[in-house]
From Swiss-Prot:
Gene name for this UniProt entry: mutS
Protein name: DNA mismatch repair protein MutS
Coiled-coil segments on the chain, per record: none
GO BP of this protein: mismatch repair
Keyword Transferase: no
Amino acid sequence: MCNIIYNNVYQYNILKNIMSFVKEKNTPVMEQYLNLKAQYKDHLLFYRLGDFYELFFDDAIKAAKLLNIVLTKRGNSCGQEIPMCGVPAHSSESYLHKLIDLGFKVAICDQLETADEAKKRGYKSIVKRDVVRVVTPGTIIEDSLLEDKSNNYLASIVEQNDEYAISWLELSTGKFFHTLTSLKALDSDLLRISPRELLISEKFTEDEKIRSILKNYKISITQHAQSFFEYSKSHRTLCEFYKIRELGSIGNFSKVEIMACGALLEYVRVTQRGSIPRLEFPKTYKQQNFMLIDTSARRNLELFSTQFGEKKGSLISVIDHTVTASGGRLLKQMLASPLACSKAINLRLSTAQFFVNNHDSRRKIREILSNIPDIERSLSRLILGRGSPKDMNLLKIGLGKTLELSEFLCKIESGENGSLPQQYVIQTEIQPASRAGITVKSDESELSTIHKSLGNHKDLFELLNSAILDNNLSSVKEGGFIHSKYNSELSELSYILNNSNKLVTKLRESYRDLTGIAALKILHNNILGYYVEVSANHKITSDIFIHRQSLANSMRYTTNELKELENKILTARDAAIGLEMKIFSELCSEVAKESEKIALAANALAKLDIRTAFAELAVQNNYVKPIIDDSKEFNICSGRHPVVEVNDKFIANSINLAGIHLITGPNMAGKSTFLRQNALIAILAHMGSFVPAESAHIGVIDKIFSRVGATDNITAGYSTFMVEMIETATIVNQATDRSLVILDEIGRGTGVYDGLSIAQAVIEHIHNVNKCRAIFATHYHELTKVSKYLKNVKCFCVKIREWNGEVIFLHEVIEGIADESYGIHVAKLAGFPDSVLNRASEVFEELKA
């Protein structure tokens, strides 16, 4: 169980008397530091000094230990030496990464001028510095601090009058969502969204139930006063950010949703120090459009990680065949929120079917996609003012590949590369296209919709291609990333920089011709700069030569032309870098004009990546297209567990589930695997993926519930049995007639009669009240009697064979009731000594008698 990391728990003792420190005799630099630190008490302050970011006082003590760097001292304050440590500015991101992962917030203080510029303001003036940004777990945008295929959400939860809202955004991609929720659903929402940082009011955590929920997650918690979430303030923040008068023009918001969204935007404004990010209009997440997977099911089904916290062995590790970062992120969103609309699901399936049938098209598209960088995140950095030449170059490459992809899709639509998939379209799937000024007809295939959403970025690509050199430069201050031919002034400066020696030599030759002195030289030193030198025996009479210095054996001169050339050479680099920075800023403005269409194209690329990835998965793993409709069917022929079958020989099993299937059989026979595989097949189908089976017909499922395995929840103070009862209570209280429930044992943590009574009552309730599809595995053979009076309960068992005193598990699910649980045999497999096994057999026979 992971603990919450509260950012405000770090106390800065040195700042308790901050103002008295400032009044003490400190150096101007230390006074500047202390004044800035007083504004960011709950942050580690990275204070720029030359080529290093320095940390002082308690910050230094903490950082040195956490980052494993040397703790030293610098000067004195209040008669005590000041602890100090530092990290090189050029490699600071790796240190930031570690601190952010530990839940710290870091305030970045940069130099706003050079030392020479500071001296112009006065001899004793120090370099101006200020905090330029605040880096927190939920607001990072740097590639080196992010995982390519994982979202990095900042979320906010607000409660007012027992109404709850949660809003979440990702600064690195511009995604922004909000939804109404409830205290009961909050746990599931947090697990689905998986935010890195959560913004809440100080009052919010006074509720014991809230604290109990939050303890289950490794989330950086940022607390603010209730006024930070105030309605009128949040409403104003939203309107000002999107430059609108009424919020109704961008969506429907409840009062509490406005408070959650507005607080997020205000927090972004504070942390970004005035830089305006690119954020989409907040989209309403409507739970009724998606399958709800309860908290227990998300964990037990190992969708994203195993019970040991590893990605390998999870469902995502098997099904992720995406080749783009944005496709990988969208796949995780789809797995977290499968669809609950048959038409929308079939829209996805039809496109995947097309790529299953058309190998060459699938291969070509995946080849192009694999060479497309993460333009979504590069775009966000460029708009926020933190983009690098590398980001601009990646955007250029991405737009070029998008044009190539668009041309290939034109061939598909013209029939050159196969027939278009069945024409489905769902209006909610294409709303973003409408906002970007793209008209999408209601009778178009999804592939056509994706094609149109890619847009035409030829003009912008050609502009960037003519301006940007291929590079991996992380800072515009380095220069050397703009084509010299793009700008005539830059071309001249580049010529000077690249040919300075040639220009000096050319001028020297012209002076030799003018004076007739073959031994004339042009030399350079730090005192005179460039100068003309001749021996003392030669006399120069031309008026263009200005005497500079007389030596015993030589005479030195300069000329206006030489001074001008020297000035050009000395200033060319600074001028070139300054000009490149100006051009870069202009290019960023051009990118900003197209940002909405670029973001739409990035989303279309992600969708296309997933559809082709699903096709690749289906072909490689022998998956079949499921039939999805609005019936209540659950008929799977020869279904397989998508994860287990990858590494082991797998026995397929069928199921035709119309009510409740009660499954008996020994441990290790495969009951739990059978339960999980059917839930996973249902989830895959609702994502729009093919499934591991010979055939599958599934009526839309609104919710999936799981009670499979149980452990103590020590942090909440719950025993194994209590956890089991809470999970079961969730099922009987929330399951509908369109839900799928899988239960693996109920009542094991109490007395036999108690457990049996509870299990039977649950089955009867699910049958008579919930009326949902359910698979119930049990060791209580007495439960099978319910099939005699509950018409929709059928009994199944796992087939076993006894041979020469041994029990062989065949892993086949057949109709019927298991004779025994074979627990003693499993104990033998586990390595019990013979004496214990023999005694267990004796006791077993006595109990049977």
